[in-house]
Amino acid sequence: MKQNSTIKKFFITVFVLICVNSWLIASTITIKQDGTGDFTTIQAGINAASHGDIVLAYPGTYYENIDFSGKNITVASLEYTTGDPQYIAQTVIDGQRQASCVSLISAETDAVLEGFTITNGQGGGQYWLLGGGINIFGDYPEMIGCSIINCVITGNVAYNSAGICVDEGNVFLSGCSITNNYAYYNGGGIGIKGHSNVVFDTINRCSVYNNRSSYSVDIVLASPFIHEFEVVVDTFTVAQPNPYFVTNNAYNTDFSFDLQNYVLEPVDHDLYVSPDGDDINSGFSPDEPMKRINTAVHKIASNTETPRTIHLAPGIYSKSMNDQILPFGCKAYVNIIGENQENTIIDGDISEDGILITSRGYEHSTISDLTFQNFQSIGGIITNYSDMIRYDNITIKNCIITDMLSALISATSGGNIAFENVTIENIEGLDTPNAAAWMNGTTGFSAKNCLFRNNTSSSSMTTSAGLYVNGNGDMTVEGCRFINNTTTSTNAIGWASALLLTDYNQFIGDSYIHDNLFVGNVNNNGKSTVYAKSMPYTKINFFNNTLIDNVSPYGCEFEGNIYCRNNIMRNIGDYEIALFYDPEITSYLWCSHNNILGGEDAIFNQFGANVVYWEEGNIDVDPQFVLVGDDPYQLAAGSLCIDAGTPDTTGMFLPPWDMLENHRVWDGDGNGEARIDMGCYEFDSEPWAYAHQPVVPAVDYQISNYPNPFNPSTTICFTVPQQGAVKLHVYNIRGQKVATLVDCVSAPGSYNVQWDGRDADNRPVGGGVYFAQLVTPQRTTAHKMILIK
């Protein structure tokens, strides 16, 4: 019995040693598509592998989407065992545009991928598809650990981070080529998030180039935890990367670059694009245009001294008609300008992509004379972390917005944003609190002569279907029309159907809301048509607005210091003005020379907690609108609102024109005294800029300038058909003469003169819109110019 026991113990010991030895010695699992290996698919080999094993794929194209499944293994081609780089191109993982080609998402800590071509992947995750080529996704503090060696990662797509996505991972990149991947939004090549640490091999260097996305085309970081990042590669797209190529969307990371080669020399020249152009063209002239807007943006230089412009020829730009890549981005100090918004159209084909998306580092740019239409996305034009951006003469229409954003949005911490002659109409917001436009965290904002019409927004709690601005600087809304915008809140009480101006991080500057028209806006399960807030040390100037037939419990809700002058307020609801109780601020309302339905009783002062100064000149009468034509809310003859506004407009900072660009202060009742009217229209006044313009004869007078926009100088060209006196003046947007460039008698012909951006006293003028006015005895005509600074 004792001998049998000893033998039994011996066999048990041997069995244990054999098992332990099998665990300690890595197995090599072969993958051959001809069936002569252990398996025919890489995933089958991974499923059979244990920690430390090698899954070795022989040449072939593997149409699969592999997952390391939490195993610390090496998955490699024969390049791993032979050192022969030819096996990289011969051993392909093709994701078939179904998901990420390779996923490491299950707590792998020491995995290796080596020697493959990774292509045709389409990201993983739910809505925001990430990592078309390789998706590395950890759960901090449990980080994914892996090495990616000698792989070619190309031809992959995703919403973000198309080539490689690293989220909470420690990743070593060695000898990889990451090129020609495309992300709809950012990170065409590599995207890095969270607490990740990505290290580039300084000996066996990677190359990252010619990837595409709307912004951060090669490398994007989206992390507040990565304060420094070193890019060490053999080849990059450009020699001196700017934020269009590399940036951190969430933090001002200190980037350093060690680049040995580059493939693109940015073109320091205006570029021309046409729907029937060709991207092999230089793009240097209208006669040799490029085709894709995205390609022109990628190619053009960002020049802080001499801003450049991408000129779009008339036509429709879309994926279906001329293979446009949407969305496209833009660089700092680059303008995108069409011929005019009627004939230069960017069409989204009702796809799920936006149209124009930018991020940190996008500044000093103008988008003008374009129409954006027919897109279905989380947002149409998205400009995050942007500063000194102008939108002039653009239309956004016939779009569907999903998932919380807007048709035009500066989503995070924007700087100074300006709208002029912007139309946003027929936008349907599905599960989004604001349909048309949302400016979030702007330093300064202005909207002038804009139209927000027929926009609808529905969500659990809506903000505004028209314009929503939460800013920490001064805000101006001037000469705008808000017509038939509708909000529907399905849960909590919503805010304002048409206009919402509020603070950002407990600060806001002065608000100037004047000469606007609000008609037919509807707030379902919400509060008001207009909401505006000031801080105790700032104020709201609410002057010369017309609010008619808007449906909401309150026409306007105010908080702070409000100066309410010269308005017409006659709406469908309980009160025209609401001042709610706030334990942290007492509101003060100064109200004079308004026509308010219900008079002083139409002001709701909750708990009597706020202070209302009901001053002189307020009335409650039928305004007597003309109710016909394109502007039916002009005052009719005999209206008691004519010449009934504030006698002295000093300190109101009103422009000299009304909604129709007629004189703002005019003697409408013919008593010999010019006085401002109530509302946004001045009765029977003459045009402001050209009040004494002669009748235009049928002769050929022409005026233009180039470049336009310009900095610091431009050449103004003009043609006169007959001999006579000629004057060429420059006016600013306020109608003030800046300079006289020509004052002489001229023979018929074409002439040009240079303007250096200085006024009559040789002082540099500020950036903005200017008009070159050509004056002859026969005709006065003008041309708009844009000075970019």
Annotate each predicted stretch with a short phrase:
Residues S22, A26, S207-N210, Y215-D276, ...:
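Extracellular/surface-exposed low-complexity segments
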Residues W23-A44, A48, P59-T61, Y251-T295, ...:
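Right-handed parallel beta-helix/beta-solenoid
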Residues V695-Y706, F710-K789:
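C-terminal outer-membrane/trafficking sorting elements
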Residues G35, N72-Q126, V157, S320, ...:
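Right-handed parallel beta-helix/beta-spiral solenoid domain characteristic of secreted/periplasmic
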